[in-house]
Curated annotation (Swiss-Prot):
The keyword Membrane applies. This is Tetraspanin-5. The gene is TET5. Residues 29-44, 96-221 are extracellular. It is a multi-pass membrane protein. It comes from Arabidopsis thaliana. Keywords: Membrane, Transmembrane, Transmembrane helix.
Amino acid sequence: MNRMSNTVIGFLNILTLISSIVLLGSALWMGRSKTTCEHFLQKPLLILGLAILILSVAGLVGACCDVAWVLWVYLFFMVFIIVALMGLTLFGFIVTSHSGGVVVDGRVYKEFKLEAYHPWLKTRVVDTNYWVTIKTCLLGSVTCSKLALWTPLDYLQKDLSPLQSGCCKPPTSCVYNTDTVIQQDPDCYRWNNAATVLCYDCDTCRAGVLETVRRDWHKLSLVNVIVVIFLIAVYCVGCCAFKNAKRPQHYGFPYGRYGMSKSRPGWEQSWSRWWHGRDRY
């Protein structure tokens, strides 16, 4: 029974070790993939995956080798990981709670408005240096090339991703075949048919990027809830493993040299021994 918690914590840390490798792989894939330009989640995933990887190795060493100080360090940093993950999850739900999607009459797809998103997200894409990085990534992807052969009927019948809706075409409300000057969305004037321009500098494109990030971050927050519950369970079992590892170091053989407890005689046993032995003198 004493080794049960050590076995369980070892098994659970193998699972967390595998999970950390998956997280690190996902983060590296985000950085190299040509089909996604999401850099918001790459660094958090790298940091989280690396932290869980190190903790998992420490937990395995401490549980399998009964090293109390390693388990103490493991549990100490596990608290910070759990608290940080809970904070990140809560922040993720707050930031991704609102979508900027607007239904377009007669269309299957939606268009997205930049002003509808959380201010923290907007400050990222409004930053010129950051947007140059995103724009370069979009130009190197196949996001808009898929729409090159679309007909006007396709735009009426087919759905578009947030990036395609915001970056690959002008807003649906734009009117270009008129001689009169009318007030239009500023993005209508940013649009250009050139493949390297399109609507990459439009606010709708920035909104499309934010919508893509919002959807993925919301899914990640849901997964984080499960991860937090799992880590709390691992922490509780780890506390039991720490007690088991600490006991033999501080008390030698707490259950006797051969694993059996040896109780001290009580007062009634001492009194009975004295009473029966007094006639010998």
